[in-house]
């Protein structure tokens, strides 16, 4: 048999084999390209919609680089690093049996340390605090990757700095009697009866509270008072409570004149009544939040605070006498209408009414640096779609 004849036989054999092969679809081909397929799925699953979430949520390796979260703070808490420069501390126990001398492995032990710590949790936990949890400076409490619920007593941040609280569900908080409580590396100190706040921030700075869910407390869900400043509350979900977010506690607390606070990308819904926020003295940017009905009012204040409401969505309650977004208190109408309460690209729905006052303030360099660029109110449903505690899994975008 000649070489030419052999080549013809080989050609026809290969052609026949090719024809007998099943036709593969694009999906079949992707079986042989797992890396491309996984990438496509990861991108589809990633739903980071605002400037803070885009900084970290689409990174599948977030669990191996948790402290990168500290680079994502925006607003007036920008630069807050929490426990970034310290060790990662894993909470292994949900117990709170000894508040004066907590055992190693508990959240209370970690929170009281004088050194920077990035605190994470070994597993899902419901931590029933027997007294308020006093958090020391330079701490991050990071609940990503597990479900962490704190109940019965809340968190106290008093005269501290550089705190990040992230992805924690705090609810059903009661007034606690006080007593000897561990607050640092030294001996326990005598603490008075707590107010029953979910989170109480007093005299503290560089505080970032992000992706937390807060509900059902005896007093306020979140109080920020007594000269606290450079605070950002972002991506949180507030539900089922009367007094939600207080920025300045009293008209005689003049130290709050320097307060700078950002309220951004939060969801206020499901039977919230008022103080979202309630402001005194300071300078406040309230930007791209979702207000899904309220009981008495949404934003209020006294003592001439500056409130810049930018790109929020206000969906008013059905009650015709509750359509006003704002509540000005503590002085006559003429004086309160001189306060700088401004609205810019807010979306007013279901008859919501926003009555602005004053004029657009001239911002200081520090105020300019802390402003988050606002998107129009029409974008708020997207921007706040992941507000509250996230369900994160290691090895995948959060």
Swiss-Prot record:
Signal sequence residues: 1-25
Entry keyword Disulfide bond: yes
Superkingdom classification of source: Eukaryota
PTM: The N-terminus is blocked.
A Pfam family reported for this protein in Swiss-Prot or TrEMBL: Pectate_lyase_4
Residues carrying sugar: 37
InterPro entries, per database record: AmbAllergen (IPR018082), Pec_lyase (IPR002022), Pectin_lyas_fold (IPR012334), Pectin_lyase_fold/virulence (IPR011050), PEL (IPR045032)
PANTHER family (alphabetical): PECTATE LYASE, PECTATE LYASE 18-RELATED
Name listed for the protein in its UniProt record: Pectate lyase 1
